[in-house]
């Protein structure tokens, strides 16, 4: 078989940038690839597969429930839809058909209304929500967040990311307090973050992760959180979620990748330098090239 790079005339990539969507994000380890392959090679009762892998992950992470989705963006859209539909069978099937007389505004700090490769607002709109910005581009306090809430608010959205403004923006714990005071759910997009328990423990009701970034799983996403909300996210499989379906291979691959990720020691700086050193030494043998850690 000719190399894929030759067959399609692709440029070979040495990824020195980390987990970038534009470069193919990550290359899962063999055990994860095996889990993906097992998924591809077998049949399952898919609802059972979704529920039981979700419950297994929830047990590993010590959260109420979890569900594997097709990617973090799909997780945002389906979480928003979940908070608008809230299990109503008519709204589930007619989300975009017309206006529904239920809260649909999603409040987020203005400094979090970013483009992570696609706009956060587009994912909110896909989920049937309307973005309401709180505070200013460079500032959002708990009271500024609260000021944007009204009777039409469905949820608060918090984006935990290097893409966002970091200074003078309230913390996840503070946002959770505002949400609780107003009886609203807090959704946290932690797509590229490394700690799978932190934001849940800080009071978020739903937390969303990208499967191929820190976790180094297949293309997929994880939504974890409070049982009722996760249940409503799962129901979106019969609504907008169908257009962003995750396959059995993605479900089994991510579940195994998370198990491996949690068991793995975090790589130390010294270990990274040790791994880099032979590569750097060989680069330095190339004429005209100077490289250092
Ligand atoms: C990468 C990223 C996403 C999208 O994740 P996908 O799994 O590629 O959909 C969403 N939000 C943030 C902050 C991200 O960094």
Regions found by a protein language model. Give the residues of each.
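Conserved PLP-enzyme active-site core in the AAT-like
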Residues: 2-27, 49-57, 62-262, 269, ...
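N-terminal glycine-/serine-/threonine-rich phosphate-binding loop
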Residues: 42-49
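Shared catalytic-loop signature of beta/alpha-barrel
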Residues: 268-275
């Amino acid at each position: 078989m000719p190399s894929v790079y030759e067959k399609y005339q692709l440029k070979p990539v040495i990824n020195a940038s980390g987990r970038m969507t534009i470069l193919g994000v990550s290359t899962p380890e063999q055990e994860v690839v095996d889990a993906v392959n097992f998924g591809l090679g077998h049949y399952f009762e898919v609802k059972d597969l979704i529920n039981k892998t979700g419950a297994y992950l929830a047990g590993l992470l010590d959260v109420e429930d979890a569900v594997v989705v097709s990617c973090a963006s799909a997780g945002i859209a389906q979480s928003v839809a979940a908070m608008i539909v809230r299990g109503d069978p008519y709204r589930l099937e007619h989300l975009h058909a017309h206006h529904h007389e239920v809260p649909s505004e999603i409040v987020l700090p203005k400094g979090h209304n970013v483009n992570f490769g696609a706009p956060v607002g587009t994912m909110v709109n896909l989920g049937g929500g309307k973005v309401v910005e709180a505070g200013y581009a460079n500032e959002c306090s708990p009271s500024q967040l609260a000021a944007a809430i009204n009777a039409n608010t469905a949820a608060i959205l918090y984006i935990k990311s290097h893409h966002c403004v970091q200074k003078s923006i309230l913390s996840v714990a503070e946002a959770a307090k505002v949400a609780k005071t107003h009886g609203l759910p807090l959704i946290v997009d932690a797509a590229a973050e490394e700690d799978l328990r932190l934001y849940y423990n800080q009071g978020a009701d739903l937390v969303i992760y990208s499967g191929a970034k820190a976790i180094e799983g297949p293309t997929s996403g994880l939504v974890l959180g409070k049982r009722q909300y996760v249940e409503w996210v799962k129901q979106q499989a019969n609504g907008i979620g169908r257009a962003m379906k995750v396959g059995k291979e993605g479900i089994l691959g991510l579940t195994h990748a998370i198990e491996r990720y949690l068991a793995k020691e975090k790589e130390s700086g010294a270990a990274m330098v040790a791994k880099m050193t032979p590569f750097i030494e060989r680069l330095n043998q190339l004429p005209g090239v100077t490289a250092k850690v």
